[in-house]
């Protein structure tokens, strides 16, 4: 298996493209079109990390600020063929590090 990197994504259009690709591949978890579109739209303005293999996103996570001192994982997904490979843990670690950098209390 090729190396998978966790990267920060800043471009809102790229965030939308990545989240749409992955969420649409997960209909058992994100099968309601209106709700899925809301996740895609809202994550465009949030801190966003992607798991990338050979220039292709295979997972992502977005952080939502809930107060000046707290946040939560707003949405997170990993393509089914990459489940159970540790990508979710790595995305969680990136979100956690971002929360700490923003001064959120854990």
Language model feature labels by segment:
Residues 50, 56-64, 71-77:
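Conserved beta-strand in the GNAT
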Residues 39-45:
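Short loop/turn motifs at secondary-structure junctions and domain boundaries
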Residues 79, 83:
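Residue-level recognition of the GNAT/N-acetyltransferase active site
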């Amino acid at each position: 298996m090729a190396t998978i990197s966790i990267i920060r994504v800043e471009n809102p259009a790229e965030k939308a493209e990545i989240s749409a690709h992955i969420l649409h591949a997960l209909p058992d978890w994100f099968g309601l079109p209106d709700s899925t579109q809301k996740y895609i739209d809202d994550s465009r303005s949030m801190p966003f990390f992607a798991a990338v293999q050979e220039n292709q996103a295979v997972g992502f996570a977005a952080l939502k600020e809930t107060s000046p001192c707290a946040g939560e994982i707003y949405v997170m997904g990993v393509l089914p063929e990459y489940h159970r490979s540790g990508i979710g843990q790595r995305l969680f670690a990136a979100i956690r590090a971002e929360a700490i950098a923003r001064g959120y209390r854990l």
